[in-house]
From Swiss-Prot:
The lineage of its organism: Eukaryota, Fungi, Dikarya, Ascomycota, Saccharomycotina. The keyword Cytoplasm applies. Belongs to the ATG17 family. Pfam families: ATG17_like. GO terms for biological process: autophagy of mitochondrion; cellular response to nitrogen starvation; pexophagy; piecemeal microautophagy of the nucleus; positive regulation of autophagosome assembly; positive regulation of autophagosome size; protein localization to phagophore assembly site. PANTHER family: AUTOPHAGY-RELATED PROTEIN 17. GO terms for molecular function: molecular adaptor activity; protein kinase activator activity; SNARE binding. Keywords: Autophagy, Cytoplasm, Membrane. The gene is ATG17. GO terms for cellular component: Atg1/ULK1 kinase complex; phagophore assembly site membrane; vacuole-isolation membrane contact site. Its main location: cytoplasm. Autophagy-specific protein that functions in response to autophagy-inducing signals as a scaffold to recruit other ATG proteins to organize pre-autophagosomal structure (PAS) formation. Modulates the timing and magnitude of the autophagy response, such as the size of the sequestering vesicles. Plays particularly a role in pexophagy and nucleophagy. This is Autophagy-related protein 17.
Length: 409
C-alpha cells in the first residue's frame, strides 16, 4: 500500500509541477507586458508634458515676449520707427538750418561774392535724408511682420494648443490617466492578483511535495515503532483521499488565471493600438512645432535687416553731429579770419606810414645835403683836381636809394 500511495503522490506532484510551470511562465510574461505598458504610459505622459512646455515656450517666450514685445513693440515700432526716426529728423533739421546759415553768409574776401556754403561738400549732409526716405519702405515691412506674427500666434494658440494639444491631453487622460479604474487595474490590482496567484501555486506545490515526502518515508519504513508508522499512514491516507479535490482546485485556479491573463492581454492589445494612435498624433504635433519653430527664422532675418538699418542710421546721425559741429566751427573760423584780415590790413597801413615818414625825413636830409654840396663845390671845386677823389667830388646824386614793397591786403 505505501508503494501505491507514493506512486500516486509522485504522479500528482509531477502533473501539478508541469501545470504550475506553464501558468507561471504566462504570469511572468504578462507581468513583463504590464511593466512595459506602465513604462510606455509614463513615456507618453512625459511626451505630452514636454509638448505642453514646448508649445508654452513657443507661444509665450519665443513669440509673445521675444518677437512681440522685444522686437515688434519695443525695438521696431518704438525704438526704430519713433525714437530713431525722431532723432534723424532732429539732426537733419539742424544740419539744414546750419547749411542755410552758411548759405546766407557772403565771403567778402573774394570778388565773385560766393557764400560760405560754396566751400563745403553738402553731400554728406544729406545722408539722413536718404535714411528718412527708406523709412516708408521699412514701415510696411514691419506692419507685414506684425500681421504674420498675429497670424502665427493665433495658429499656435488655436490649432496647436487649444485643438491638437488639448485633444492629445484628453485622449491621454481618457485612455492612460492615473485616475482611470482601468489604469489602477493594470498597474496595481492585476500585478497584486498575479503575485497572490503565484503564492497560491507555490502553496499547492509545497503541499503536494510535503505529501510526497511523507509517502516516501512510509515506503522506506524508517520508524522506531509501529505507532509512529500507523500515525503517519493515517495522515497520508487522509491526504491521499483529498488529492483529486486538490488537483481539481489547482486546475480551477489555473483556468481562472489563464482567463485573467487572456483578459489582460486583450486590454493590453487595445492599449497598444491606442498608444500607436496617440503616438501618431504626438509625432504630428511635434512636426508642427518644428515647422513653426523654423518659421521664426523669418523674424530673425527681418530682425537682422532692421538691425543693420538701425546701425547705419546711428552711424549717419553721428556723422551729421560731427558735420554740424564742423560747420559751426567753420563759420566761427571765418569770422576770426575776417578779424585776421583787418589786423593784417592795419599792420600794412602802419608799415606804409613808417615808410612814408622815412621817405620824408630822407628827402629833407637829401635837400640839405644838396645845398651843402653845392656850397662846397662853389668854394673849393676849382682848386681840387678830379683825380684826388675820382667821380665823387662833383657828384650830386642822392646818398640813399629806398626800394620797398608793402603787400596790399
Amino acid at each position: 500500500m505505501p508503494e501505491s500511495l507514493a506512486e500516486r503522490a509522485r504522479s500528482t506532484l509531477l502533473k501539478a509541477q508541469v501545470l504550475c510551470r506553464e501558468v507561471e511562465s504566462r504570469i511572468a510574461e504578462v507581468k513583463d507586458r504590464l511593466s512595459q505598458w506602465e513604462k510606455n504610459r509614463h513615456t507618453l505622459r512625459f511626451l505630452v508634458s514636454c509638448l505642453e512646455h514646448q508649445l508654452g515656450f513657443l507661444e509665450q517666450c519665443a513669440l509673445r515676449q521675444g518677437i512681440g514685445r522685444a522686437l515688434i513693440e519695443t525695438e521696431w515700432s518704438q525704438v526704430v520707427l519713433v525714437d530713431l526716426v525722431n532723432e534723424m529728423k532732429l539732426w537733419y533739421d539742424k544740419i539744414q538750418l546750419r547749411l542755410e546759415r552758411l548759405d546766407q553768409v557772403e565771403n567778402i574776401l573774394v570778388a565773385d561774392n560766393k557764400h560760405l556754403s560754396h566751400y563745403i561738400s553738402q553731400e554728406q549732409a544729406l545722408v539722413l535724408k536718404k535714411r528718412l526716405d527708406e523709412v516708408p519702405i521699412i514701415r510696411p515691412q514691419i506692419e507685414n511682420i506684425q500681421t504674420q506674427y498675429d497670424t502665427m500666434c493665433k495658429r499656435v494658440r488655436q490649432k496647436l494648443i487649444n485643438k491638437r494639444l488639448t485633444e492629445i491631453k484628453t485622449i491621454f487622460d481618457s485612455q492612460f490617466g492615473d485616475e482611470l479604474t482601468e489604469t489602477a487595474e493594470l498597474t496595481e490590482v492585476k500585478p497584486r492578483d498575479l503575485d497572490s496567484i503565484e503564492l497560491e501555486l507555490v502553496d499547492y506545490i509545497n503541499s503536494l511535495t510535503d505529501h510526497f515526502d511523507k509517502c516516501q518515508a512510509l515506503e522506506k519504513g524508517l520508524f522506531n515503532d509501529s505507532n509512529e508508522y500507523d500515525e503517519l499512514l493515517k495522515i497520508v491516507s487522509a491526504d491521499d483521499s483529498q488529492l483529486d479535490d486538490i488537483m481539481k482546485h489547482l486546475l480551477n485556479t489555473i483556468d481562472s488565471t489563464n482567463h485573467q491573463i487572456d483578459k489582460v492581454y486583450e486590454i493590453l492589445d487595445i492599449k497598444t493600438k491606442q498608444k500607436t494612435i496617440l503616438h501618431g498624433k504626438i509625432n504630428e504635433l511635434i512636426a508642427n512645432c518644428t515647422k513653426y519653430s523654423e518659421y521664426l527664422a523669418i523674424f530673425k532675418g527681418i530682425a537682422t535687416s532692421i538691425e543693420k538699418f538701425k546701425e547705419g542710421c546711428m552711424q549717419d546721425i553721428q556723422l551729421t553731429k560731427e558735420l554740424y559741429k564742423f560747420y559751426d566751427e567753420f563759420e566761427n573760423s571765418y569770422n576770426k579770419l575776417l578779424q585776421e584780415v583787418q589786423r593784417r590790413r592795419a599792420l600794412s597801413q602802419k608799415m606804409l606810414g613808417i615808410i612814408k615818414n622815412c621817405e620824408n625825413e630822407l628827402k629833407t636830409l637829401h635837400d640839405e645835403d644838396q645845398k651843402l654840396r653845392t656850397h662846397f663845390l662853389s668854394e673849393n671845386g676849382a682848386f681840387l683836381p678830379e683825380t684826388i677823389w675820382p667821380g665823387e667830388i662833383d657828384d650830386l646824386s642822392p646818398l640813399y636809394a629806398l626800394d620797398y614793397h608793402i603787400k596790399e591786403i
